[in-house]
């Protein structure tokens, strides 16, 4: 039986590191007060435990989740971890402990706080990815298509398959300027590149500027002034996306 302890787990912020926190929790038969990653290190009244990332332990936990708890729980945990909200780690840990105690069917018990928390985390990530599939605007840069996004959550893994399937013959780069990671596709190679301190994309080609002017003119020409409804537009297309959209960036 695990007991609640006034201790904080420190980890490196990676998914593998989080899995090692799950391992640590079970090894010590305890539930920590919280789980923080090193980049947000701050003072606390509670003692801290540095949880080192061990790939062997991480793989053991991952294998256990998939084999004992099933794909639904696995995807809920993976998507929940992509969420950018603070405190996601302890909520995911409590969720996993409930699943191991009650079995994978407990994942459908959305009335349980542990389940509701993770459903909310995963849903927020999925919703933002769905929005970005609609709102991403590519520009021609240095012989390939480039786009910038500013998401709250780390959604690039959920955009990868969509855009690779949608543009099978195009080289492209999608840069997440909040997490400093780019999804890059060149030919058959698809990978992620992390940048320290950010990445400044090259300016669009001159031909691209011409196309953008034409697109803006077309967008404005379609508008019916009498039916303009700014509140409704922001409901369907939140303003935080506008700065990276060709037709709306001037209004952002």
Where are these regions (language model features)?
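Long, compositionally biased intrinsically disordered terminal regions
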Residues: 169-171, 177, 182-186, 200-252
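Internal, well-folded beta-alpha domain core
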Residues: 104-195
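Charged, alpha-helical interface segments at or near domain boundaries
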Residues: 36-130
